[in-house]
Amino acid sequence: MNTHAKRISRRTILRGLGVSLSLPWLEVMGPLSAWAESADPKTVAPNRMAFLYVPNGKHMPDWTPQQEGKDFKLSPILEPLADVKNKLMVLSGLTADKARPYGDGGGGHARAMAAYLTGVHPNKTDGTDIRNGVSVDQAAAARVGDRTRLPSLEIGTEHGAMAGNCDSGYSCVYTSTMSWRSATQPLPKEVNPKIVFERLFGSGDKAQAQRNARRRSILDYVREDSKGLERNLSTNDVRKLDEYFSSIRDIELRMDRAEKLPPVKVPDYLPPAGIPASYEEYIRLMCDLVVLAFQADVTRIATFVLANEASNKPYPFIGVSDGHHDVSHHGGDAAKQEKIRKINLFHTSQLAYLLKRMDEAKEGDGTLLDHAMIAYGSGIHDGNAHNHEDLPVLLAGGGCGTLSPGRHLRFEKETPLNNLWVSMLDRMDIDVEKLGDSSGKLPGLL
């Protein structure tokens, strides 16, 4: 180990048979500011953004904090976030206006997801003449995507169709796709963690297939490269690299277990090989892949659909054997509302897992969460009413010092949700005049 090591490029990659392994930031790479390649000299690390979507709205009385500002108390649904409360903002009053009918009748679920990141009213069709708008993640990818191996990462836990009627005459693509590269080009999400892993770290050639057949760790194939690298690293860098490799190996072992275990039989759901039988483990495995992707700077932009809009997935492992969509239409029934609360609480617990994992990943004088913006929410306020104002939305992370978290902010009624997205783009040094129905930037985020 060398305490006076010669600097290495931030683009250093460890290579082996079918493997191309990017590295996290190390001291030997020089200042984080150089790694960030930012136009802002105050930026100390690359800023990342991720968008997590949950369907069917929330039980809002248990979502919205009663107090505003820094002295707010976490509501019952938000209680799992207690450990990272000072690193998130609950944002009330935001509206997805373009998810409203505008004369198109039913289809509130399809419009909710389609308009969530675009701020555009989707064309009502169950055919091929789909039309929406560019989503915020792809607006960002178009500007900074060439700085990383993958321009963006789109993942989820439920497959989606590119055609067919899934909601009152709206194409299934609208209920299952959050990312849109253009008005007519939706980006389907990947739901198999093994394939996501290979996208992040594989080379996509015949050697990769050979490595898969031998069922060895990717770390086995970069061992020689890593040994040569470690000889020039400080003690801190060696420890950080070891933690990074341990995270990769943990994910590999979890994927292997998922392939070997028999699937749990749930009505209308049979997970394919490589997908954990436990839904919680499935989500957390995907979360860990996002953390690795951001750590290694494989991408700086991610979307994660925890379940498709109008998903009727049951949650028997938390005592809810009814379908999610079914109980979201509670009609004021207290028993159904309690089931919705349980599902909402489960989803928030998974968000807490992601945020804590990011906050544990040290990066310079801060953490990965300090150098990111993680938006979480739904395009529906209350699943029983199918309304799209005052949405359940929160924003976590420090945005490289451009956000002042630890608060509950309430904005004026009908404030466009896309004003938040434009504000996030601004913090990525991406200036856009307008995105969808945006009317400006959100005040008070810093």
Q: What feature does the model see in each segment?
A:
Residues 1-446:
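Ligand-binding pockets and gating/stacking loops
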